């Protein structure tokens, strides 16, 4: 059954992570988020105060180690903790994709665990850059990384930053990730979801959250 506009909106993190975003842009994002009835907004750590100050009762998410993941774990953890202290209720952190490709799952787990410990009860989503893992390794690697995220205390696994040259979310990746975590964790599809058809395909594949920057266009596409 096709969801209603309100039902689809409830899956969405309305996202603005462009480096040129201003506090005014974030305030407009929050206003639009409240109008559209989305689950949350997702903004850069420096923009969390602006999102909180914009009010409207909208849940705020932020990012850590974004977008490369090539940050010392202690830096990711501190960045995430600062975002939570500023009012973020959720953190989307980026793994070290190179470590994952090298088979260093202990390092991947330790990196995630450091952020998990730093954010307390905040929701932790782990961005695995699924397109890179599939393009540069294989399905087994993606599954193993998702299970490592679960072992380290993640609440969600997330496909993509949307900034990696190998691409964003795919139905194939979402299905593999959903199977890997077996309903024990959420699955967030993000990156390149531009139409209602894209969004519905991700939900059908097992996504439980969607990261969208063009949320209004996606919702309007439901007809």
UniProtKB/Swiss-Prot annotation:
Transmembrane segments: none annotated. Pathway: Carbohydrate degradation; 2-deoxy-D-ribose 1-phosphate degradation; D-glyceraldehyde 3-phosphate and acetaldehyde from 2-deoxy-alpha-D-ribose 1-phosphate: step 2/2. It is found in: Cytoplasm. GO terms for cellular component: cytoplasm. Its EC number is 4.1.2.4. The active site is at 92 (proton donor/acceptor), 158 (schiff-base intermediate with acetaldehyde), 188 (proton donor/acceptor). GO terms for biological process: 2-deoxyribose 1-phosphate catabolic process; carbohydrate catabolic process; deoxyribonucleotide catabolic process. Catalyzes a reversible aldol reaction between acetaldehyde and D-glyceraldehyde 3-phosphate to generate 2-deoxy-D-ribose 5-phosphate. Belongs to the DeoC/FbaB aldolase family. DeoC type 1 subfamily. This is Deoxyribose-phosphate aldolase. It comes from Mycolicibacterium paratuberculosis (strain ATCC BAA-968 / K-10).
